[in-house]
């Protein structure tokens, strides 16, 4: 190989990696010299080539190109020969594979080529002198310290040879070429030509320093040996204990491999002084002071471990973190005295002390130069440059801010976000101090290459190979990796290192210490802590919610200085300013709103809105747990989820679990927004109880709706009414709520009212619920309804008798209802009189009369209500609920039960009203009570009765244009309230899909009725006729779709009642009269329940003309409305009032009563469970049941008509009766099941024709699974215009029929026009069944083509038989010239008996052929024998019994015995002809004696004929007969029969007079359904159509 001088001379401008010696000296002298001109540049590329990291996002092709370029730059093929390149590569690889214990020694010898290396290895034992090597090592530190500024050029060809970087991956370093190349490098180039390894250069220089300044050993005379020794030390750094210079070069090599150029703030480059702006800097302008990257490194900044935002401050690369930080960290221990064999061997304490003492001198300026690479150096010129390089490298890591070296041996005292971690800095500083500390001390230390130079500071474990040590350090790095992660989040190289070290976890939670791979994961994790804090804050009712968030320093470390924005309100941080702006919108204007809200809530004693901070806290964390259920405490992210959840409580029993009513079941949602909206508005109108001023009356109404919707009373002390009416007098402002007792003993009834006077006068009884007070007395009215529904089904367990006065407000009533339902299921009946303040147009006819009478048995106070129907029921009016309550624990206010609580009344009471009668409780506010309330209120108003009774009014008197709470629409199902009916309508659609509205336990399941009364037989006789008609309307629970209708209707009722009161005083109509008469005897103390509809009579304009419905008493302002309404009553409704005693689920609240006439509630059809939001829809729907007799039921004598539902609901009947749900439509008369409604329709028509069906017994329930109920109804009632000719199913439009016909096209059979397969009675055909039957032999085939081919066989057989018969006849004629023996081929079609074969009648007297069942008819018509036996003319063959046996069973005779009329054959089925001897197929004419007979027979037989069993026609040819048969039926009904060929019990035969219709039922076709027999198939098919419709 050529010497390095030659190589460098040929290519002086191709080097980039600097000579360590010239690096410092030349940069100071010639700062503008350009690097990249010398062979040492090849070492840089060599290191890059050997340590290039594959990064996926760069791509494989680019990586390959990069590798090729680096290899070319390293090997420089344009300046070197192939032999040199090969020698270089082989030597490098050889040095890699030699034993570890030989590597230091071999490197010290610096073999120039492979031959020299082999020689060294052969003479290893003789040449090995560890003492000399150790001594040569000792002097490095001192020399390096003294001569670091000297810059002497390398003086040995081998100066760069031995310095090879051998990392743990076993990368070889060719030392010889590097020595040569570096030797030829002149000082001017500043980068001595090295082979491919820059470490060789440095080591050579350091070796020379050792030779000059130490004890002048053999290395002093032989600098190459010293250099080679250093090379050995460096080379063995990875594997064995040796000089720390190798560590330094190892680290430098790894930096170079990452494309990093090191520079220092003072302008001294790490490896090239001043190269920050020259040399490769010029080639790579992206590099500058500090640690800079090559262009390719810059392109993949993440890959090479360079922080995006801190390129000017420094970077930690992957390799550097692994090998440098941990190795340098171990330098402290590695330099310890117990490992004195190591080159600068000294104890940790010693070198620490020394390093601290020398800070002021050289170490102070270059204190970290040797540190990062664990280097102790011999002192000479090359060592100085080496140390400068190392110093700059360290300064890059530890003095990035340019403020000088940091002298703390533990590392930089202040942490920078962009510096490496303290562990690394500490390790590097310790190693630098150790390597630079005490050269004199290290000189005395011998070097032992077998020692373990790498010692772990954490656990004290030592390693001989740096790779093992680094791997070990990785385990400890996991503990401190998060520190790195804070500063180098964006560095891919660092992230890769961290992943390899700690599994990718580099973000640590400050709360629990958990680490995460991604910052997003950490953010999500922190939310958990935040939520926990939120819950804690809620529990502690804290006003300010703490927002745990990353600190500014953390954010700076993670995202950089400019990558976070903090919200000053909640301290939440964001990466983007836009996110912060969006977030701050949450806080905008909340403070004022919250202040107002809290003030109002405090006035009312309630705080339902959280503090702003807590509210913001909830919003910040994704609104999680924002909606909380007050029943069970569960929280939800969305209000809809909470609503769904609350249904569970309302259905089951919201009070069972907690033992109390929900403290607050307010569902945040639209109503919350509206509530906030109303509170946020400027309010000028005085709201007496709420102490709010409203700008507009509508706002006051909205506010009142809020109060009436949700009563949140924190304690008993809050005596504000929920229902507020500004214009009312103070006496009228009776805001009565029903509040629970804390114990059963406290049974005093009182009314909580804003008027203390009224409170004293008319206290309402508080309900005891589980002996627990209810802090909030009212749940959502809807929730209550649902609870009532669910509990009503359960039925009451022995209820605890409780009653309460029936003075309730909007939600109070609902609340009572809810608890009525819930308490009943819990075994307690709260016998409170639920008197709704809505108009009752007529006295309710319910069982309430009896119930109230019996309620008096247990309670002394009972409201005597006109609705209680009988003047005989005029129980003394409740004297004073207060008295009653004080006198009797079981004080049971009269409970007025209305029609509206049909379901609850039926189910909640359990067995019926009887139990309620005993307890005197009616859990549902009644429309009867409403009537009474209205009547009493108006009466009292007219009579100016004193305000001794508490009055509830939900609507104001006077000229107010608004109706408080009138616009509030509440959902029965979940309690949600809506300001617009359209919102409620949309909302109710959800419930329509979710659950059945009805229950099997309800005979009558109409949810609401316009009229508040129920038909009752106990009603006064004089009012009964009129009431019965009105009850119809009431039972229908007519509602109006819009709030305008509500107000209008309510106004009608109010005016109606008011005018009645004005004119009659007590009598408006029969209803009013009765109501007033009933209640006229009540004392003044009776609580006057003034309904929401009880408007000031003076309010009603005389001009307002009311049009009253004569049938139901409903009033309309517009005549057209009345006309439309009367259409409902256009038909006669047969209503058994007793059937509807429990017909309606109670309404929710006063506003609900108002809405009873607005159509906002659901009306349920008791027959099919269909629910409707308007009563007219129910009427129209029920008309279907009434008109369609198939759908009538015995228990439903009324025929309420209804439109189709606005939204089809699930089949309630099917849900109530799962056994029927899976079945098809089934006829209850005959049990026949049908898949299609049309089939049932046709089938039922048969029953009607036969008068077998009565309307009450037809169908209990017809269920069509899979089809909409409305579709079924339509199919039952609409005229069928288009009928399928195949199966008979009919359709409304041709499109449906066309779709249906396509079904039959794919079926494997053909339908005849009159054919319906009997299997359709139950289910359609599912298998491939033979449908094509051969008329000749009875065989059946699936396809008609097969049948055609089969018939061809029969034709061939017929021809053969004809020929055979002709031949036989000819033979017979030969025997008897005068006697012709005709041969006949008989075709028996459709028979299960095989075709008869030609037979020759025996001419001899002893042979005679006859059919077994058919009498043998002689040609001349003679019949001998009393039993019709067949005899020959001369009687020769006659037997005593006249029978001739036919052994082979053939039925055909040549004499025409089988050619007899069908009638004759039928008449003589038993006739048999015997054949004593001969077989029937004897060819000879034995037995044939009479020629005339033979002639006659021949004439008869020569032309055979075929009988058609269906039309009795006869055919002479089989083809004609076959064609004729096709005319009867193109399809044979296939049914199992006893014999092959039978079809529907029919045996088809075509025979001659002697042929075989010999069985009685051969001619009959049997119906499989009813067993009836028919003469022909056509009749059977027609009959079967009657079964299938």
Curated annotation (Swiss-Prot):
GO cellular component, one term: nucleus
InterPro entries, alphabetized: C2H2-ZF_domain, SCAN_dom, SCAN_sf, Znf_C2H2_sf, Znf_C2H2_type
Residue stretches making up the SCAN box domain: 46-128
SUPFAM superfamilies xrefs: beta-beta-alpha zinc fingers, Retrovirus capsid dimerization domain-like
Region (4 X 5 AA repeat of P-X-G-E-A): 1419-1444
Pfam families with a match to the protein in the record: SCAN, zf-C2H2, zf-C2H2_6
Region called Disordered, residue ranges: 128-230, 266-306, 319-349, 588-610, 838-930, 1056-1104, 1396-1496
Zinc finger (C2H2-type): 454-476, 507-529, 565-587, 627-649, 969-991, 1107-1129, 1163-1185, 1225-1247, 1282-1304, 1332-1354, 1506-1528, 1565-1587
Region (3 X 7 AA repeat of P-E-V-E-A-A-E): 1398-1418
Sequence repeat extents: 1398-1404, 1405-1411, 1412-1418, 1419-1423, 1426-1430, 1433-1437, 1440-1444
Annotated GO MF terms: DNA-binding transcription factor activity, RNA polymerase II-specific; RNA polymerase II transcription regulatory region sequence-specific DNA binding; zinc ion binding
Composition bias, Basic and acidic residues: 143-152, 161-182, 206-225, 295-306, 588-607, 868-881, 1071-1082
Keywords: Apoptosis, Cytoplasm, Metal-binding, Nucleus, Repeat, Zinc, Zinc-finger
Source domain of life: Eukaryota
Entry note about domains: The SCAN domain enables PEG3 homo- or heterodimerization to control gene expression in a combinatorial fashion.
Chain's role: Induces apoptosis in cooperation with SIAH1A. Acts as a mediator between p53/TP53 and BAX in a neuronal death pathway that is activated by DNA damage. Acts synergistically with TRAF2 and inhibits TNF induced apoptosis through activation of NF-kappa-B.
Family statement drawn from the similarity comment of this UniProt entry: Belongs to the krueppel C2H2-type zinc-finger protein family.
Protein name in UniProt: Paternally-expressed gene 3 protein
């Amino acid at each position: 190989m050529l010497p390095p001088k030659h190589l460098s001379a040929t290519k002086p401008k191709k080097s980039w990696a600097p000579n360590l010696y010239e690096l410092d000296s030349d940069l100071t002298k010639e700062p503008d010299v350009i690097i990249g001109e010398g062979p040492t540049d090849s070492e840089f590329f060599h290191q890059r080539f050997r340590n290039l990291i594959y990064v996926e996002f760069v791509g494989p092709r680019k990586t390959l190109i990069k590798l090729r370029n680096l290899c070319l730059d390293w090997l420089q093929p344009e300046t070197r020969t192939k032999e040199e390149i090969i020698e270089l590569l082989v030597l490098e690889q050889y040095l890699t594979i030699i034993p570890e214990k030989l590597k230091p020694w071999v490197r010290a010898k610096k073999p120039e080529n492979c031959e020299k290396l082999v020689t060294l290895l052969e003479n290893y034992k003789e040449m090995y002198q560890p003492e000399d090597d150790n001594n040569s090592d000792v002097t490095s530190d001192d020399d390096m310290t003294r001569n670091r500024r000297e810059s002497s050029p390398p003086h040995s060809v081998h100066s760069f040879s031995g310095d090879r970087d051998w990392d743990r991956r076993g990368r070889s370093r060719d030392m010889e070429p590097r020595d040569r190349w570096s030797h030829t490098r002149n000082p001017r180039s500043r980068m001595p030509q090295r082979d491919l390894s820059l470490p060789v250069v440095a080591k050579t220089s350091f070796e020379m320093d050792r030779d000059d300044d130490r004890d002048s050993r053999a290395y002093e005379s032989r600098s190459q040996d010293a250099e080679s020794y250093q090379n050995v030390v460096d080379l063995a750094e990875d594997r064995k204990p040796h000089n720390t210079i190798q560590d330094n070069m190892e680290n430098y090599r790894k930096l170079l491999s990452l494309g990093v150029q090191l520079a220092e703030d003072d302008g001294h480059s790490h490896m090239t002084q001043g190269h920050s702006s020259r040399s490769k800097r010029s080639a790579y302008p992206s590099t500058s002071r500090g640690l800079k990257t090559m262009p390719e490194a810059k392109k993949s900044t993440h890959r090479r471990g360079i922080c995006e935002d801190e390129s000017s401050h420094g970077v930690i690369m992957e390799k550097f973190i692994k090998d440098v930080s941990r190795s340098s960290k171990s330098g402290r221990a590695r330099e310890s005295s117990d490992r004195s064999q190591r080159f600068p061997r000294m104890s940790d304490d010693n070198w620490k002390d020394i390093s601290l003492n020398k800070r002021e001198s050289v170490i102070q300026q270059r204190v970290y130069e040797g540190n990062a690479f664990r280097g102790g150096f011999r002192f000479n010129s090359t060592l100085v440059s080496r140390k400068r390089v190392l110093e700059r490298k360290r300064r890059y890591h530890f003095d990035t801010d340019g403020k000088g070296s940091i002298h703390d041996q533990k590392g930089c005292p202040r942490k920078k976000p962009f510096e490496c971690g303290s562990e690394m800095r500490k390790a590097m500083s310790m190693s630098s101090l150790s390597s630079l500390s005490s050269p004199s001390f290290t000189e005395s230390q011998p070097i032992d290459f077998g020692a373990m130079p790498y010692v772990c500071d954490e656990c004290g474990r030592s390693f001989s190979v740096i790779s093992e040590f680094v791997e070990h350090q990785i385990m400890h790095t996991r503990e401190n990796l998060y520190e790195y992660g804070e500063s180098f989040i964006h560095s891919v190289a660092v992230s890769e290192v961290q992943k390899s070290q700690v599994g990718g976890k580099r973000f640590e939670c400050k709360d629990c210490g958990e680490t995460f791979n991604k910052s997003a994961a950490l953010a999500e994790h922190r939310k958990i802590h935040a939520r926990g804090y939120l819950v804690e804050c809620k529990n502690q009712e804290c006003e300010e919610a703490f927002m745990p968030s990353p600190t500014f320093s953390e954010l700076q470390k993670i995202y950089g200085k400019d990558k976070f924005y903090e919200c000053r309100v909640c301290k939440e941080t964001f990466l983007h300013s836009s996110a912060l702006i969006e977030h701050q919108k949450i806080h905008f204007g909340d403070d004022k709103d919250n202040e107002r809200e809290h003030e109002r809530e405090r006035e009312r004693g309630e705080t339902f809105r959280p503090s702003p901070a807590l509210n913001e806290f909830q919003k910040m964390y994704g609104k999680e747990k924002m909606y909380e259920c007050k029943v069970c405490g569960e929280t939800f992210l969305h209000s809809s989820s909470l609503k769904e959840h609350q249904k569970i409580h309302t259905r089951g029993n919201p009070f069972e679990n907690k033992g109390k009513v929900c403290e607050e079941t307010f569902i945040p949602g639209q109503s919350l927004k509206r509530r906030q909206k109303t509170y946020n508005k400027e309010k000028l109108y005085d709201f007496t109880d709420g102490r709010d001023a409203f700008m507009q009356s509508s706002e006051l109404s909205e506010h009142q709706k809020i109060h009436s919707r949700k009563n949140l009373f924190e304690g008993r002390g809050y005596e504000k009414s929920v229902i507020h009416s500004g214009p009312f007098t103070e006496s009228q402002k009776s805001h009565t709520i029903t509040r629970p007792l804390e114990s059963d003993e406290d049974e005093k009834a009182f009314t909580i009212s804003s008027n203390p006077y009224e409170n004293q006068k008319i206290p309402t009884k508080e309900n005891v619920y589980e002996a627990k007070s209810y802090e909030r007395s009212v749940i959502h009215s809807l929730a209550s309804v649902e609870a009532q529904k669910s509990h009503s089904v359960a039925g009451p367990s022995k209820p605890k008798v409780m009653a309460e006065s029936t003075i309730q407000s909007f939600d109070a009533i609902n609340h009572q209802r809810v608890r009525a339902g819930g308490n009943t299921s819990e075994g307690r009946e709260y016998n409170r009189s639920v008197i709704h303040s809505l108009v009752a147009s007529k006295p309710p006819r319910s069982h309430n009369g009896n119930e109230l009478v019996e309620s008096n048995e247990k309670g002394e106070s009972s409201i005597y209500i006109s609705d209680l129907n009988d003047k005989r029921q005029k129980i003394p009016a409740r004297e004073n609920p207060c008295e009653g309550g004080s006198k009797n624990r079981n004080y049971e206010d009269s409970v007025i039960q209305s029609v509206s609580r049909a379901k609850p009344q039926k189910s909640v009471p359990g067995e019926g009203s009887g139990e309620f009668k005993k307890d005197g409780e009616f859990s549902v506010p009644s429309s009867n009570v409403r009537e009474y309330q209205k009547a009493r209120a108006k009466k009292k108003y007219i009579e100016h009765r004193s305000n001794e009774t508490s009055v509830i009014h939900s609507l104001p008197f006077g000229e107010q244009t608004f109706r408080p709470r009138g616009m509030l629409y509440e959902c029965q199902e979940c309690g949600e309230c809506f300001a617009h009916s359209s919102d409620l309508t949309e909302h109710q659609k959800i419930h329509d899909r979710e659950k059945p509205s009805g229950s099997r336990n309800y005979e009558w399941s109409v949810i609401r009725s316009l009229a508040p009364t129920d038909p009752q037989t106990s009603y006064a006789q004089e009012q009964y006729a009129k009431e019965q008609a009105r009850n119809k309307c009431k039972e229908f629970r007519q509602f109006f779709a819009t709030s305008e209708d509500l107000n209008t209707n309510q106004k009608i009722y109010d005016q109606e009642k008011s005018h009645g009161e004005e004119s009659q005083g007590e009598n408006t109509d029969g209803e009013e009269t009765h109501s007033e008469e009933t209640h006229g005897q009540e004392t003044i103390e009776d609580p006057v329940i003034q309904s929401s509809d009880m408007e000031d009579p003076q309010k009603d304009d005389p001009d307002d003309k009311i049009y009253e419905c004569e049938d139901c008493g409903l009033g309309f302002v517009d005549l057209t409305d009345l006309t439309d309404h009367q259409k409902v009553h256009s038909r006669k409704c047969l209503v058994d009032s007793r059937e509807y005693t429990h017909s309606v689920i109670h309404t929710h609240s006063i506003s609900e009563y108002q809405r009873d006439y607005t159509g906002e509630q659901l009306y349920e059809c008791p027959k099919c469970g269909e629910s409707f939001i308007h009563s007219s829809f129910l009427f129209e729907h029920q008309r279907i049941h009434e008109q369609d007799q198939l759908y009538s039921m015995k228990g439903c004598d009324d025929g309420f008509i209804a439109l189709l539902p606005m939204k089809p609901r699930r089949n309630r009947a099917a849900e109530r009766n799962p056994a029927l749900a899976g079945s098809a439509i089934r006829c209850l008369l005959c049990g026949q099941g049908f898949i299609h409604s049309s089939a049932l329709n046709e089938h039922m028509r048969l029953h009607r024709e036969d008068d077998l069906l009565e309307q009450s017994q037809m169908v209990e329930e017809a269920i069509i699974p899979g089809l909409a109920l409305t579709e079924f109804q339509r199919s039952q009632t609409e005229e069928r215009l288009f009928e399928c000719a195949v199966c008979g199913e009919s359709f409304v439009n041709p499109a449906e029929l066309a779709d249906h016909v396509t079904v039959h096209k794919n079926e494997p059979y053909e339908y005849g026009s009159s054919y319906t397969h009997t299997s359709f009675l139950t289910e359609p055909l599912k298998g491939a069944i033979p449908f094509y039957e051969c008329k000749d032999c009875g065989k059946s085939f699936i396809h008609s083509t097969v049948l055609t081919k089969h018939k061809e066989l029969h034709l061939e057989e017929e021809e053969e038989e004809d020929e055979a018969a002709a031949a036989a006849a000819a033979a017979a004629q030969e025997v008897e010239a005068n006697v012709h023996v005709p041969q006949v081929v008989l075709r028996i079609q459709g028979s299960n008996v095989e075709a008869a074969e030609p037979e020759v009648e025996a001419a001899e007297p002893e042979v005679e052929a006859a059919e077994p069942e058919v009498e043998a008819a002689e040609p001349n018509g003679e019949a001998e024998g009393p039993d019709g036996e067949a005899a020959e003319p001369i009687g020769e063959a006659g037997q005593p019994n006249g029978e001739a046996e036919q052994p082979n069973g053939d039925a055909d005779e040549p004499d025409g015995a089988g050619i007899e009329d069908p009638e004759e054959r039928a008449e003589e089925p038993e006739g048999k002809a015997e054949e004593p001897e001969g077989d029937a197929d004897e060819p000879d004419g034995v037995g044939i004696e009479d020629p005339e007979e033979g002639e006659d027979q021949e004439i008869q037989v020569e032309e055979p004929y075929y009988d058609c069993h269906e039309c009795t026609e006869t055919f002479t040819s089989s083809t004609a007969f076959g064609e004729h048969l096709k005319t009867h039926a193109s399809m044979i009904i296939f049914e199992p029969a006893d014999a092959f060929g039978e079809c529907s019990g029919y045996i088809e035969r075509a025979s001659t007079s002697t042929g075989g219709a010999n069985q009685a039922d051969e001619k009959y076709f049997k119906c499989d359904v009813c067993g009836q027999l028919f003469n022909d198939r056509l009749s059977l098919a027609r009959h079967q159509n009657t079964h299938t419709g």
